[in-house]
Structures are given as structure tokens and as C-alpha cells.
């Protein structure tokens, strides 16, 4: 089953990333190590901590009327 969420701000994006990571059973530390970034950076992303890049991105999206969606797969337990 696919879950699709409309992403309106950094917080929503962070929540989607966190949900997907948790469903995959991957810790913040594991994800950070795999990507070569700090665990703190993963935590900040999941918390929707604003940064210049994110603020600009969402300002441009809003001003131009562009919508952003995030989609991830969830195993449907009913199928088992």
C-alpha cells in the first residue's frame, strides 16, 4: 500500500521521512552512517528544523503554486 502526503512545510516533510524510516526499521544513527551525515542532521530534518534552503524552497513552491507530495510504500498486513 502506498501512502501519499501533501508536503506544505519542512515539518510535514520531516514527519514523512521519519515515518518511512521507522517503517523500514532503520535508526537515525544507521541512516546517518549510510548517508555519510550526522545523526543530528537526520534528527533536525525529521523535526522540520527550518534552514535557509528549506525556507527558500517552500517560499518558491508557495509563490509559484507548485505542490509537493511525498510517497512511500507500507506493507499491507491484511495481505498476509
Q: Language-model features: where?
A:
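A short, Lys/Arg-rich alpha-helix, primarily the initiator
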Residues: 1-22
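Short, charged recognition helix plus adjacent turn
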Residues: 3, 69-80
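Short basic helix-loop element that most often maps to the first helix and adjoining turn
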Residues: 15-30, 34, 59
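Recognition helix of helix-turn-helix/homeodomain-like DNA-binding domains
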Residues: 36-50
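DNA major-groove recognition helix of helix-turn-helix/homeodomain DNA-binding modules
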Residues: 53-71
